[in-house]
Amino acid sequence: MTQKRLFGTDGIRGTANTAPMTAEIALRVGQAAGLLFTRGDHRHRVIIGKDTRLSGYMIEPALTAGFIGAGMDVTLVGPLPTPAIAMLTRSLRADLGVMISASHNPYEDNGIKLFGPDGEKLSDATEMEIERLLHADLSGQLAAPAALGRAARLEDAAGRYIESAKSTFPKSQRLDGLKIVLDCANGAAYRVAPTVLWELGATVIPLGVSPDGFNINSGCGSTAPDYLCAQVVKHGADLGIALDGDADRLLVSDERGHLVDGDQIIALIARSWSASGRLRGDGVVATVMSNLGLERFLKANGLILDRTRVGDRYVAEQMRATGRNIGGEQSGHVILSDYATTGDGLIAALQILSVLVEEGRPASETCRVFAPLPQKLKNVRYHRDNPLLHPRVKQAIADAESGLNGHGRLLIRRSGTEPLIRVMAEAEDETTVIRIVDELCDIIAVSAESETQVHLS
């Protein structure tokens, strides 16, 4: 196998009870990953967590059966943030960690994310090997009856993560006097995130903390930030924090109800850590989606912006390769490798709050670190073939790049997690940005529709 079929940029993802997100495939994933990670003579263990989707009740036991059949003991921790699973995998010296989540997607979708014993997302090569085993005949490799694994629940898993998150906040600081609106997206952090802020002294106004299996990311969380911004203004809060369904990313609202994206958060933390001597390396790592304003701000402060392809796993890989300890995405994935191996929305929020406490200024001043260039991102859904291969689309892209004449950026790519074409343009002139994105999206949409009609005819 020369390329991955099941694994995208963030694990395996799809519509629940439809391939590849079926109980049968989840069972095979458990068997394949279990066989790959049962090396050595010690008892082997996998940590399995999930978010609050209804389909988690289907995927969790299927994975559990697969791992047990491969001879691995399974530790079930229930609904917890993705970064908590990475942390527990390291802390409990497990061989593997698994998070059942489709992150910011609606409840109909689900996914499987895998972490190695170091708490890092698996490499492309390892994922390819799991896919190879998944399609192989494993009947002669599974555990003998006496070597089957066992399953048990870790009752204090939430408490362990709560204490781990709190330990990243300066012991000399408290959140007394701060009113914070916290939107947990009816997702994995609905219990732990409010507890952390409350125990540190904040007055917490919790939103999205009543999951029912269907309402994850539904009109709430980081995918619906307007709700957060409105609630911040309504309650006269000092700050608003919105997490996504698995709490590995965040967006923030200042006290005026203005949104603060991942680029501003990265700049804020980088400025603070650079001033205190905590910033490692000569800059930060972000993706090609990050605003040129962030790059200019860092350059003005003697730092560089090291760009990677889209996906927090690629940001993390580049951080490890370069020794940098801050990285992230405009979408709100913020990786602080001093504390976590993956994006952690709650830990990033605590760093923002630490700066607010230290500076004593309102969030509208503290969190507006640089002036972003006009930028527009728009998605076009497609159903079958890649519309970017259509000659008319290729010509339109070439014309748009020529029109920018080196005074802006154009980025067009397929999503690694959904059947979407993402179109982003950035330039000094907002009117130009809007026109280019809208025109390209119209052409891509027409091409995608024509391809569908060809296949249906």
Swiss-Prot record:
Molecular-function annotations in GO: magnesium ion binding; phosphoglucosamine mutase activity; phosphomannomutase activity
A Pfam family annotated for this UniProt entry: PGM_PMM_II
InterPro entries documented for this protein: A-D-PHexomutase_a/b/a-I (IPR005844), A-D-PHexomutase_a/b/a-I/II/III (IPR016055), A-D-PHexomutase_a/b/a-II (IPR005845), A-D-PHexomutase_a/b/a-III (IPR005846), A-D-PHexomutase_C (IPR005843), A-D-PHexomutase_C_sf (IPR036900), A-D-PHexomutase_CS (IPR016066), Alpha-D-phosphohexomutase_SF (IPR005841)
Keywords recorded for this protein, A-Z: Isomerase, Magnesium, Metal-binding, Phosphoprotein
Cofactor(s) this protein cannot do without: Mg(2+)
Modified residues (Phosphoserine): S103
PANTHER family in UniProt: PHOSPHOGLUCOMUTASE (ALPHA-D-GLUCOSE-1,6-BISPHOSPHATE-DEPENDENT), PHOSPHOHEXOSE MUTASE
HAMAP family given in the database record: GlmM_B
Protein name: Phosphoglucosamine mutase
Organism listed in the record: Granulibacter bethesdensis (strain ATCC BAA-1260 / CGDNIH1)
